[in-house]
Amino acid sequence: IEIGGILLDENFKELERFSARCRLPQDRVPSATALCINKSNVDLLTKGNLSHYEMLSQVEKKFREWSPATFLGYSSINFDDEVIRKEFFKSLRKPYITNTEGNVRHDALNIVRAAFAIDDNVLKTELNPKGNKSMKLESLARLNGFESAGAHSALFDTELTVKVLDLIKQKQPILWQEYFKTSSKIIVENMIKQEKIFTVNEYFFGTSRLYLCAPLHPNACMHPVYKWGQSVDLRFDVEAIQKLSYEDLKKEMKKSP
């Protein structure tokens, strides 16, 4: 495992950086594909100074020194956070350090997607093989003037993430703080309760879909188990929906959006 992190202040200025790499545990088999993507080799995996446990100890110590903070990376919620949680759990450490004890987590990829939902030309992009705009970090960094030859090493990817986000911050200064509000579940829930209309941006197979929604009354339309608020897609005729029977409404709810 290799990890790289940069501590920033509220103005996005660097305060400190941290990087560490450990030897591969003897019970693990390396992936040849991962070695190629990360420009690594067997020597780097087997001859590092730190054991797996020692490195995780350093990571936990550094995370606690930097807390409370907003932890974010590029596609980190779906990948990096899950790796950290699993490795911390297996080494008998608290796995949810990035979103407890005053910390919150966010994902730079989601901020980039939100920025494009507001302004489709906020950053230069290229098309992927499916004809959609590529949201890959290396692609965005390269096309917007940042050196990306070292992409896929941990600390270098962190540097690229900071540069891409800082460019969005410069181009959309008024919206910058709004993007970070979505790091808090409580703030998002309150926004939905207070606003009469809000927009949801979802990604399916690399394509952005925007939905204009209106929240339903919380006293009657909360999820029975998870207590999530529910809303209606305003593309559809609300009056027609209101006239549906309970069984017909259930059928409509199960259809693909």
Question: What spans do the regions from the language model cover?
Answer:
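Acidic two-metal-ion nuclease catalytic site recognized across multiple nuclease folds
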Residues: 166-257
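A mobile, often basic/glycine-rich helix-loop segment
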Residues: 92-101
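Short, solvent-exposed loop/turn segments at secondary-structure junctions
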Residues: 77-79, 111, 237
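Acidic, Mg2+-coordinating catalytic module of metal-dependent nucleases/exonucleases
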Residues: 70-77, 83, 120-186
